[in-house]
Amino acid sequence: MELLDSPAPLRPLHDNPRLPKADGAQKRLSVERIYQKKTQLEHILLRPDTYIGSVETVTQQMWVFDEDVGLNCRDVTFVPGLYKIFDEILVNAADNKQRDKSMSCIKVTIDPENNTISVWNNGKGIPVVEHKVEKVYVPALIFGQLLTSSNYDDDEKKVTGGRNGYGAKLCNIFSTKFTVETACREYKKLFKQTWTDNMGKAGEMTLKHFDGEDYTCVTFQPDLSKFKMTILDKDIVALMSRRAYDIAGSTKDVKVFLNGKRLPVKGFRSYVDLYLKDKVDETGNALKVIHEEVNSRWEVCLTLSEKGFQQVSFVNSIATTKGGRHVDYVADQIVTKLIDVVKKKNKNGVGVKPFQVKNHMWIFVNSLIENPTFDSQTKENMTLQAKSFGSTCKLSEKFIKGAVGCGIVESILNWVKFKAQTQLNKKCSAVKHTKIKGVPKLDDANDAGSKNSIDCTLILTEGDSAKTLAVSGLGVVGRDKYGVFPLRGKMLNVREASHKQIMENAEINNIIKIVGLQYKKNYEDRESLKSLRYGKIMIMTDQDQDGSHIKGLLINFIHHNWPSLLRHNFLEEFITPIIKVSKNKEEIPFYSIPEFEEWKSSTQNYNSWKIKYYKGLGTSTSKEAKEYFADMARHRIGFKYSGPEDDAAITLAFSKKKVEERKEWLTNFMEDRRQRNVHGLPEDYLYGKDTNYLTYNDFINKELVLFSNSDNERSIPSLVDGLKPGQRKVLFTCFKRNDKREVKGAQLAGSVAEMSSYHHGEASLMMTIINLAQNFVGSNNLNLLQPIGQFGTRLHGGKDSASPRYIFTMLSPLARLLFPPVDDNVLRFLYDDNQRVEPEWYMPIIPMVLINGAEGIGTGWSCKIPNFDIRETVNNIRCLLDGKEPLPMLPSYKNFKGTIDELGPNQYVISGEVSILDSTTIEITELPVRTWTQTYKEQVLEPMLNGTEKTPPLITDYKEYHTDTTVKFVVKMSEEKLAEAEAVGLHKVFKLQTNLTCNSMVLFDHVGFLKKYESPQDILKEFFELRLRYYGLRKEWLIGMLGAESAKLNNQARFILEKIDGKIVIENKPKKELIQVLIQRGYESDPVKAWKELQNKEEEEGDESGEESAAATGPDFNYLLNMPLWYLTKEKKDELCKQRDNKDKELEDLKHKSPSDLWKEDLAAFVEELDAVEAKQMQDEMAGITGKPLKVKGGKQGGKQKVTKAQLAEVMPSPHGIRVVPRVTAEMKAEAEKRIKKKIKSEKNESDEKQEGNSSGDKEPSSLKQRLAQKRKAEQGTKRQTTLPFKPIKKMKRNPWSDSESDSESDDFEVPSKRERVVRQAAAKIKPMVNSDSDADLTSSDEDSEYQENSEGNTDSDTTSKKKPPKAKAVPKEKKGKAPKEKPLPDAVPVRVQNVAAESASQDPAAPPVSVPRAQAVPKKPAAAKKGSTAKDNQPSIMDILTKKKAAPKAPRRAQREESPPSEATAAVAKKPGPPRGRKATKRLTSSSDSDSDFGSRPSKSVAAKKSKRDDDDSYSIDLTADSPAAAAPRTRPGRLKKPVQYLESSDEDDMF
């Protein structure tokens, strides 16, 4: 019983019939049913979807081939499993092409009536031979037994479609009858066998002898019942037919027959055409196909898709209908290139992402891939990673160019516009609301959005303060019809703004919301205007140029989006007075400066009126606001549309495409203004008393043009002094303050704003001050202010400067030598708010625009000028003074140790320094100019160390040894990588070369006209002509002033002598009688005072009351009668007579000097001080390193010095490094030529060309070792060469320049010595300055006559001097006599000439000398070599260079030192007594400046005294003995040395306005 009860699964059922069915028995049976084992054949039939896909019918869109239509995409109902088994047989046939290239034909026959399909192919058949292991013939094995294949060897790289060993067997299994016939010539047998019943029964195999061509034919009858079908319907036949076409297109050189007809497909390209017939793009043109057969394994076609991303692709003849990684691999390459093009063309539109670009592509890919993998047996999606493809598909430039032009880009751009419009429309409300929320600071009109909204006006104000003014005025006109909204600063230029900017711009969105505007709505009639919340916009801005710009931007905003609104006079402006004059209770407002000037010239006693300037709307009071709104007719000016010329004017002002037209517009304006000045005509102005409306054309051409011009004036410097207005204001203030002590940057900024009437933010002013004082490499070559504190370094390009609250500055000792105080008297000073401010331009003794360079972007023009060497420039001026042509100049940056080579006209390549230490280490010791250390580290070395997604790591490590002034990276890399990098060019690989293009040398000339210069020589020549003329004016002024002082001393001496002799008795006599006596005896009224009054009559008339003026015109003998009694003593009498004689002699000496002599004296004094300053800088830099050991408690000096030497070695270049010479190749020069041509074409761009990326290196095959050997030979061979080399070989000093001063001073000035071009003669430059009708000329001609009159002692000519005030008066009273002794001058000039000659004779690049000493050329040459050797000669060791630096220059420097003390003495602070003082006495113009109260002061009076005298701006006495006060100050503060600084990089503050 136990046995009967126990579960016995093997017991027959009839053996225990009486056994009751219990729950346990049910469970037993379910276990058997649940857990079953099937054979593989059963499994395939039971679960077909695992192997062949679904056996249920599906309906989806597919490409099919219909007899009547051809290839088309339509909804198809088919069974994927049936489609797949057919496809397996077809792909097997195509695979045979990869095994046998001679295969040429495939025949596909589909017989729906008989439910029979056959695929026949020629080419090598299946081996008809018995398999020795399986003991069965191979065809029977691979077609009739599962898990058999020839594709299982993954070590064998195959490009066939078969992969898993299922394909043909699956077709056999799902067929009622499956026949294989194959003929094998090799085995001379024909094999044939048939399987039936889903491969359940194998028929008898037949073998026959065969001697023909190989072939294989598979014929099968699908088991339609397994697919729930009864016949092969139209859809499945159409799908199979398309696969036949696929094979014809994807298999090369194979004819495909379908049902006996050959398919008309001759390759992949013609196959693609089947898809595109009758397809057109958006414009109705046939789609353009770009085709490329990349290599034997890849063929790609591309065209435009109008319904998302489409792809037709094949992997080894398999149709990958879902794509895969092979499609992504190709598509991503195309997308990357297209997206760059789209971004360029769509800078301002909606951001475009890669998938959005892809959505416009239709791509066709035919590929052969080794051992491909798929995500399923259905093989619709290829999953193999690209790195395993076994081949690459790099699309050519030609293909990419075609892709850009085939319509895809245009389609994307159209889509972008559509999307942008859609997004913008979401910002607008289509319904008019009476109340709106979420707009802060809006004071809405009560009727806005109501039925009366068309009568409402929205007042847009410039800032909150202006809103307050408008709200005050609303008290008069009421709030029902007027709303107010303040704008924050300037509006966006929507014409050129990006879509993102417009979408995110709160100002624009708020205005649209407040007014109720809708994008793309056409406001053609009055009805459409009623849909708006406001019927008008009134613009209320300051009456300055920035206010005009805001008005223009608002007009542009409306015109760009809703041009029809302008025709409805939708816009108005509210004007307020710029100036009000009042007298008693009468008040006159003026709405423009020219109108005020007209009134002034026509009103005799205008001085008696109170004049008030209104700088902005904030100046007006609430009471005045109410007055403005009460007289709405006068203050409300409507904009009136006058026709197409208005549209053209607005577009001209704001469109990016109108750059050239804008240049012409501004040029015409400048010329018109100049002509008006020349002819004394008033400026044109808009707002007269009767002005009620304004056309847009008038607004643009008469008001907005003033802003555009002022934008240029603020952004582009003057040729004369190289300064922008903000910088000039800083300099003016520093000259006027004449600080003896350093001053905080923030305090100086406040002082500038006060003294020079600066109207912009002080933050930008502080940046200007910082920029003027910076002296790191790549900034200024000559900083006009001293950087006392952290003003920025080359580590961050100056961005690491400390807050202006913490840093100090003061004038550089060189500033007043560059801008001599005596020249201030002949400059034309400007007036702002009736306050005398800075001059139109200063007049330096050298062109500062070349020394410190310039950079700025204005309206229509941009400016970019590199820095040039100070001494080269000085020598060129001396050449011009001697009647010679200036030598060509290369850009030069102070303390830059790299090289600058010329590639073409105004095209240069700047190279850093790199040397090789050993086979795995290089050392970078200089970066290209304006490549900042930190930026280089982050953007170049870090990616090289860590690698990026696209590039593997190149270096293994780097170490940093920089200081704030030097660069040193020691970089480690593998030997192989270093060899590769060296072959390409280390400068190229490590991005140590940048291009400098100077095709935008645009400057304001001396008459305020923008002019483009072709070369630095052109700038130099124009400056030279003007400066020489101003030396003539200076001489005339000095002759007049000295004549007056001489007359005064003569009168004083005669008066004393006559008093002593008793000829004049003054005791106990009335003053009137004394004056009468003096007049009778021929004494003049105070000559100095009279001369000054003559010079300043116009200014005095403006500043003083009528009564004071009258008093000043009477005779003044106080200069005689106020002399102290002790002047009657013998000593004082003799001293006075001596002063008189000295003054006469000084005057005579001056008369004998030519303007050229005066200039040469100034240059000599400047160069002497420059030497002293640079020597001091060098000394400070070396302090603590090579100089005195630092004091440490308990430390020994010796030990300390060792430490400092170690420190020095650490930051200095390694002595063992082999310098790598920068390559300047023909390829780089060709690139430069291309850039020039491109520049000519693209001159329409507003912004100037920026420094371009790294240049490519040459393709020299030689290794470093070979190249160095060749280089050494070449250098030795060319050492004496006297002809100009044609290929830049290495780093050297400036070529024609052998400057004595630079020698003594050091390695700072390294300039490539070889010039590849012959001296360029500047095309005869226009010299408008000589006979120009500018204001300056008119002024100077007046001065000439005046000087002559004064020199003769005439004092009656006050009335003739109307035009003199601005120029005649000098801020400082004392003229700085800076002429050095006669001795140094001859020294300097001839030696320079000799040096130029000497060096031009040996202009060979290999010549070591950097420059030639002032005294003896021969001994100095070796010293100079210190620099050159590093750069050029046989790669000497750094140690040699260092010893040369230390030893060789020492002696010459000492010799120089003996001459230089006088220059130090001239620095007014007289800290060092002794020898320096001797120099002072020999200054060229010695005279003590006499004032009314101190006529007997001695010539030798201390500098401090003289300086204090200059502090008084109204004191006009001139002490020609005194050294420049500015020069003096530095002597007290010797610590700060100047380095090249330029305000270019961070651009002057003016650019920020």
Curated annotation (Swiss-Prot):
Region of interest: Disordered: 1-25, 1095-1114, 1186-1553
Bias type Basic and acidic residues, positions: 12-25, 1242-1262, 1371-1385
Subcellular location: Cytoplasm; Nucleus, Nucleoplasm; Nucleus; Nucleus, Nucleolus
Broad class of enzyme this protein falls into: isomerase
Listed InterPro entries: DNA_Topoisomerase_II, DTHCT, HATPase_C_sf, Ribosomal_Su5_D2-typ_SF, Ribsml_uS5_D2-typ_fold_subgr, Topo_IIA, Topo_IIA-like_dom_sf, Topo_IIA_A/C_ab
Record has Metal-binding as a keyword: yes
Known catalytic reactions: ATP-dependent breakage, passage and rejoining of double-stranded DNA
The protein's name in its UniProt record: DNA topoisomerase 2-alpha
